[in-house]
Design a protein with these regions (language model features):
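C-terminal/domain-edge helix-coil "capping" segments
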Residues: 18-22, 101-160
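Short acidic low-complexity segments
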Residues: 53-66
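Surface-exposed short loop/turn segments
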Residues: 63-111, 118, 122
């Protein structure tokens, strides 16, 4: 019985950010994010979350972990019928946390990440994107583990 209780306690305990305690990080952009200027929109909300994380920012190689951003958007689709028919896009943001030694592939897939997704009529809303980045970053820091990409519902980021 004690083993069952202990197992339930361990399973119920959230994955803590303890493995990240005392670590340093660097934010990495893809070459296309950097070259296009898209990083100017992506980095500020991520940097704000990271500044409050307790991790130490590094300005160059040698950080313990690499934090990256992967964005995605579909081409949209009609949803609803009649007067309620609207064209919606699904946008998503994955915030990744990878060990410095992990080689992030070209498409940006991190060792660990949280993907926040949202259906919206306008895929270019900066406020929704900032909210998704913040949500995914906070969730990733809170639930960090060595590997896996996990979803989080992003509908709270939809502009009302």
């Amino acid at each position: 019985m004690r083993h069952l209780i202990l197992a339930l306690i361990l399973l119920a305990a959230p994955a803590a950010a303890a493995p990240l305690t005392g670590k340093s990080y660097i934010i990495e952009l893809s070459s296309s994010q950097y070259a296009s200027g898209y990083g100017n929109y992506l980095v500020p909300p991520l940097a704000a979350v990271m500044a409050k994380s307790g991790l130490t920012a590094e300005t160059g190689p040698g950080a313990d972990v690499v934090v990256n951003i992967v964005t995605n958007s579909d081409i949209g689709r009609w949803v609803g019928t009649g007067a309620n028919k609207v064209w919606l896009y699904t946008i998503s943001v994955t915030i990744g946390i990878s060990p410095e030694a992990y080689a992030i592939p070209y498409e940006g897939t991190p060792a660990f990440g949280i993907t926040a997704a949202l259906e919206t009529p306008n895929p270019d809303r900066q406020d929704e994107m900032e909210c998704l980045i913040t949500l995914a970053a906070r969730t990733a820091l809170k639930n960090y583990r060595p590997t896996g990409i996990f979803p989080v519902e992003g509908s709270s980021c939809k502009r009302r």
